[in-house]
């Protein structure tokens, strides 16, 4: 049954010939209910169920008794992915119903948009570099095309992350025409606030742009220039922890000694949990450079969310069009709800995207089953499950039927407005470059100390490139907001962090790959059907996935007026040609490619 709005009515029907009775077993809010189903014509049993009035997850399956007194169950498949039920003699997994707020809305521009993720330091430099803007102990690379440095600096295997290349906000503004030429309408930046690392996930001051990136005025000017070109800017909000080298913690005394580590009377003392002040404190995954914050602390909540000039409000007034929330599944649900309420109060058309790596409809975090698509937290998440499905399919780890099943499970369990707003990515700063993965030359995510700059020969590069183009066509044919990780479109390939965070190869781009991305992006942006049309997903044999998108009756899936249209894309993951029947004809799809069908 999938997702349903609160307080709606749903009629459940099950065909069960030659049984005496069928019972519907339901779980809601830690309570169990059983209802006898009514027998109707055709051997069916049915029950009209009232969906609860509050958002959450509802679970159910059917219990049948035959004339001999035997008990049979009809429930979810063992993989829990929904679809057609399975009959068993033992208790099965339950079907899921995602109960969501009927007032749930996501911005239209998300489902219509195309995103690019950019690490500011690695994209483009404008105006040169100045050593005085670098954090203490950091350095600039001598050459833009150097590999990022890997210096393991502790027993946990973390990277020192103190090497910089000089990318800045003015550098991004300088390249807005290029960005727009790729069809991009949304830019997501990794953190840009002051911090002593190149990745900036250890915030030093939430109210300041990092000096190596520019100034607040530079940010405002970038937002204004981007807006003129139809591009919105999303910021990275790191709110589960701060840096130890920060205004708020100040372990090293670099910020005046008023932080929680230095001063027991610090105004920030209640933000942190000390087991034995000052050296023994809770930190993110045990990294003492990332002290955890208590998100429910009133003063912290006021500083980040509710205050008149909170972090959230300040940067949205400066031009940000929304936020991507770092480790969203580690933030308390009430914190997320408060954040959503304030953000939408400032700008109802802003976006809130969560970093959730697993199924966002039922993520188990800290002993709590959480659902992020009921309308009270985020608009969408980074769609890592789709990334895994696409890459697994293209590398022959799963077949076409498996791929279709994974995507249909997402569609079934997610509200439509969430499903069509998902951030659909192939690469990110936390994963190896997609081309490297698709080249299939070995493990691209070994333990950090075993990572190194790889060199692909022409054969392996071309193999990964063919697969990448096909994979990107598949991403752009599916509902959701496609996201380019900067440089993927230009031919960058690398192992995971830090090498996946290399610089954009200006002047060394793979022009053929660029044009393939650009053509795909433009095709999507010109087609209502590819953005908000209905979807039919078909597995054709083991190797071909056929995606059909259509608008009928003059309206898209959200009821918005749109011209009738039908688009189809077939992707063949095999290394050899495959033939499919389409439109009454037999058509050939070359190996490891996508075919645009008319």
Residue ranges of model-derived segments:
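Substrate-binding/active-site clefts of carbohydrate-active enzymes
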Residues: 120-186, 192-318, 339-346, 362
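Carbohydrate-binding surface patches
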Residues: 11, 537-583
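Conserved, mostly hydrophobic/aromatic
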Residues: 118, 179, 189, 206, ...
């Amino acid at each position: 049954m999938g997702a349903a709005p609160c307080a709606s009515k749903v009629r459940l029907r099950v065909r069960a010939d030659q049984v005496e009775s069928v019972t519907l077993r339901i779980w809601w809010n830690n309570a169990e209910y059983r209802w006898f189903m009514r027998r109707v014509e055709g051997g069916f049993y049915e029950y009209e169920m009232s969906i609860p009035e509050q958002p959450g997850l509802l679970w159910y399956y059917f219990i049948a008794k035959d004339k001999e007194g035997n008990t049979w169950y009809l429930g979810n498949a063992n993989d829990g992915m929904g679809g057609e039920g399975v009959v068993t003699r033992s208790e099965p997994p339950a079907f899921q119903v995602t109960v969501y707020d009927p007032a749930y809305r996501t911005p239209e521009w998300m489902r219509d948009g195309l995103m690019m993720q950019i690490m500011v330091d690695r994209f483009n430099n404008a105006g040169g570099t100045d050593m005085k803007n670098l954090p203490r102990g950091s350095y600039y690379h001598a050459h833009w095309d150097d590999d990022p440095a890997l210096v393991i600096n502790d027993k946990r295997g973390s990277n020192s992350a103190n090497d910089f290349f000089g990318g800045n906000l003015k550098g991004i503004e300088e390249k807005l025409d290029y960005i727009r030429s790729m069809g991009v309408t949304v830019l997501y930046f990794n953190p840009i606030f002051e911090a002593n690392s190149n990745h900036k996930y250890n915030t030093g001051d939430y109210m300041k742009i990092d000096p190596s990136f520019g100034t607040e005025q530079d940010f405002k000017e970038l937002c204004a220039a981007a807006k003129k070109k139809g591009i919105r800017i999303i910021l990275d909000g790191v709110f589960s922890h701060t840096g130890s080298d920060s205004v708020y913690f100040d372990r090293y005394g670099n910020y005046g000694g008023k932080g929680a580590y230095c001063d027991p009377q610090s105004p920030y003392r209640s933000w942190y949990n000390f087991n034995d002040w000052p050296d023994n404190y809770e930190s993110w995954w045990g990294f003492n450079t990332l002290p955890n914050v208590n998100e429910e602390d009133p003063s912290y909540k006021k500083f980040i969310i509710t205050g008149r000039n909170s972090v959230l409000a300040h940067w949205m007034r400066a031009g940000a069009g929304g936020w991507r929330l770092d480790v969203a599944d580690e933030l308390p649900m009430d914190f997320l709800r408060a954040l959503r309420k304030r953000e939408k109060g400032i700008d109802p058309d802003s976006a809130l995207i969560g970093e959730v790596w697993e199924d966002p409809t039922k993520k188990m975090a800290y002993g709590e089953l959480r659902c992020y698509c009921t309308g009270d937290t985020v608009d969408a998440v980074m769609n890592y499950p789709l990334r895994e499905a696409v890459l697994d399919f293209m590398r022959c780890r799963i077949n076409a039927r498996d791929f279709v099943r994974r995507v249909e499970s997402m569609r079934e369990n997610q509200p439509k407005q969430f499903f069509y707003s998902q951030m659909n990515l192939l690469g990110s700063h936390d994963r190896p470059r997609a081309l490297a993965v698709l080249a299939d030359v070995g493990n691209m995510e070994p333990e950090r100390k075993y990572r190194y700059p790889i060199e692909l020969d022409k054969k392996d590069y071309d193999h990964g490139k063919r697969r990448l183009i096909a994979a990107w066509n598949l991403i752009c044919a599916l509902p959701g907001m496609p996201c380019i990780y900067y440089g993927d479109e230009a031919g960058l390939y690398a192992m995971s962090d830090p090498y996946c965070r290399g610089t954009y190869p200006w002047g060394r781009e793979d022009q053929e790959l660029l044009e393939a991305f650009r053509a795909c992006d433009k095709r999507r942006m010109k087609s209502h059907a590819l953005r908000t049309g209905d979807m039919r997903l078909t597995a054709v044999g083991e190797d071909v996935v056929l995606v059909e998108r259509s608008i009928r009756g003059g309206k898209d899936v959200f009821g918005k007026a749109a011209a009738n249209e039908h688009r189809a894309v077939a992707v063949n993951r095999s290394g050899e040609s495959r033939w499919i029947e389409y439109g009454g004809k037999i058509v050939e799809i070359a190996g490891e490619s996508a075919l645009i069908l008319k």
